Amino acid sequence: MGKVYVFDHPLIQHKLTYIRDKNTGTKEFRELVEEVATLMAFEITRDLPLEEVEIETPVSKAKSKVIAGKKLGVIPILRAGIGMVDGILKLIPAAKVGHIGLYRDPETLKPVEYYVKLPTDVEERDFIVVDPMLATGGSAVEAINALKKRGAKSIKFMCLIAAPEGVEAVKKAHPDVDIYIAALDEKLNDHGYIVPGLGDAGDRLFGTK
């Protein structure tokens, strides 16, 4: 059964304050999102398995630990998820990066995939799906669906800010997926924005509307 983790680390909360602030410019916003993604990746990878190897220091031979051959994949949901990728790759530079693009069907209002590019060895990888916002949960649910349809067995979802409605939607559709959140906000408003949230993450990351 998947769990929900909300990070209360002081550095994450400090940086989130400036991410939320409407007066934060594009450059600083982009840097802060990347930094928080790095801090969250540190926590998410805490359970990676280790194995012992023998090395030689300048002083003597020694036994030490390395990550036990895990294959990791980072999957940003386009377009805002791209802003979190480099922060994760700073800690896990060998991870493969895929992409999932979704658009909202004008009639059903449900997300539909228009672009999926994944590593070839999907079944062998542990995936982290990233998107700054988890609002209604529709995009996250569909992105995880896209991975599972292609054989993914191990999936985590990571976002900066979530609404309770989005968390419940992902838990209901994918009860096996762990959800990692920097902040759990109050609710969604009538327009589907998280309150208090941070506005449109994609617009603020790329300086476009």
Curated annotation (Swiss-Prot):
Keywords: Allosteric enzyme, Glycosyltransferase, GTP-binding, Magnesium, Nucleotide-binding, Transferase. InterPro entries: PRibTrfase_dom, PRTase-like, Upp_B, UPRTase/APRTase, Ura_phspho_trans. 5-phospho-alpha-D-ribose 1-diphosphate binds at R79, R104, D131, P132, M133, L134, A135, T136, G137, G138, S139, D200. GO terms for molecular function: GTP binding; magnesium ion binding; uracil phosphoribosyltransferase activity. It catalyses: UMP + diphosphate = 5-phospho-alpha-D-ribose 1-diphosphate + uracil. Pfam families: UPRTase. Pathway: Pyrimidine metabolism; UMP biosynthesis via salvage pathway; UMP from uracil: step 1/1. SUPFAM superfamilies: PRTase-like. It is an enzyme of class 2 (transferase). GO terms for biological process: UMP salvage; uracil salvage. Uracil binds at I194, G199, D200, A201. Its EC number is 2.4.2.9. Allosterically activated by GTP. Belongs to the UPRTase family. PANTHER family: ADENINE PHOSPHORIBOSYLTRANSFERASE (PTHR32315), URACIL PHOSPHORIBOSYLTRANSFERASE, CHLOROPLASTIC (PTHR32315:SF4). NCBIfam families: PRK00129.1, upp. Catalyzes the conversion of uracil and 5-phospho-alpha-D-ribose 1-diphosphate (PRPP) to UMP and diphosphate. This is Uracil phosphoribosyltransferase. It comes from Geobacillus sp. (strain WCH70). The gene is upp.
